[in-house]
C-alpha cells in the first residue's frame, strides 16, 4: 500500500508541476500580445488556459481519490492538501494571464500611452517567480519558496509605481483616462498572479516544515 501511495503522490505532484508549467508557458505569449501588439496570439493564451482548467479538474479528482483510498497522514497529507488548495490559485493565475492578453490585444488597437517598462519588468519577474516556485515544489526547497515570497514584494512595488505614473498621466490629460485605467487593470492582473504564486509558496513551506511560522 505504501508503494501505491507514493506512486499516486508522485503523480499528483508531477501534475501540479505541469499545471504550473502551463501557466509559465502562457506568460511569454501574453507578454508578446501586450508588449509587441501581437493580438494574433490571444487565441494561444486562451488555449493554454483551457489546458490549465482541464488539469485542475483532473488533479482535484485524483487528490480526492488518494484521500479516500489511502487516508494519508503527516507530510503525505500535507502534500495532498497543498495541491488541493493550490489548484484554485494556479487556475486563477491562468485566468489573470488571459486578462492581460485580452487587455493587451485591445490596447494594441490604438497608439500606446507610454512604454510599458514596468509592466515588462513585472512579466519578467513573474516568470522568474514561476520557475523558482516549480523548483521549490519539485525539490521541497524552503529557501526557494521563501525567495518566491520575497520576489512578490518586488512585483507589488512595480505595480505601485505603475499606479503612480498612470495617475500622473490622467491628471495631465483627461483623454488619457480610458487607456490609463486599462493599463492599471493589466498591472493589477499581474500583481494578482504574483499573489497567487506567493500563496502556493507559503503552502510549500508548510508542507516541508510542518510549521506556519
Curated annotation (Swiss-Prot):
Its main location: cytoplasm. It holds the Pfam family PhoU. InterPro entries: P_transport_PhoU, PhoU-like_sf, PhoU_dom. Keywords: Cytoplasm, Phosphate transport, Transport. It comes from the Bacteria. It is found in: Cytoplasm. One of its GO terms (molecular function) is protein homodimerization activity. The keyword Cytoplasm applies. One of its GO terms (cellular component) is cytoplasm. Belongs to the PhoU family. Plays a role in the regulation of phosphate uptake. Homodimer. This is Phosphate-specific transport system accessory protein PhoU homolog. It comes from Deinococcus radiodurans (strain ATCC 13939 / DSM 20539 / JCM 16871 / CCUG 27074 / LMG 4051 / NBRC 15346 / NCIMB 9279 / VKM B-1422 / R1).
Amino acid at each position: 500500500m505504501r508503494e501505491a501511495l507514493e506512486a499516486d503522490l508522485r503523480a499528483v505532484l508531477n501534475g501540479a508541476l505541469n499545471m504550473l508549467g502551463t501557466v509559465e508557458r502562457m506568460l511569454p505569449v501574453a507578454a508578446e500580445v501586450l508588449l509587441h501588439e501581437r493580438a494574433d496570439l490571444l487565441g494561444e493564451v486562451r488555449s493554454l488556459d483551457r489546458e490549465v482548467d482541464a488539469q485542475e479538474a483532473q488533479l482535484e479528482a485524483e487528490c480526492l481519490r488518494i484521500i479516500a483510498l489511502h487516508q494519508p497522514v503527516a507530510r503525505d497529507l500535507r502534500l495532498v492538501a497543498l495541491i488541493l488548495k493550490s489548484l484554485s490559485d494556479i487556475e486563477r493565475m491562468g485566468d489573470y494571464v488571459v486578462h492581460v492578453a485580452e487587455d493587451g490585444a485591445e490596447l494594441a488597437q490604438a497608439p500606446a500611452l507610454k512604454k510599458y517598462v514596468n509592466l515588462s519588468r513585472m512579466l519578467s519577474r513573474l516568470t522568474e517567480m514561476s520557475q523558482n516556485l516549480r523548483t521549490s515544489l519539485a525539490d521541497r526547497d524552503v529557501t526557494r519558496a521563501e525567495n518566491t515570497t520575497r520576489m512578490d514584494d518586488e512585483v507589488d512595488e512595480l505595480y505601485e509605481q505603475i499606479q503612480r505614473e498612470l495617475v500622473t498621466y490622467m491628471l495631465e490629460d483627461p483623454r488619457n483616462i480610458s487607456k490609463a485605467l486599462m493599463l492599471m487593470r493589466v498591472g493589477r492582473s499581474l500583481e494578482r498572479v504574483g499573489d497567487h504564486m506567493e500563496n502556493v509558496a507559503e503552502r510549500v513551506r508548510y508542507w516541508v516544515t510542518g510549521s506556519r511560522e
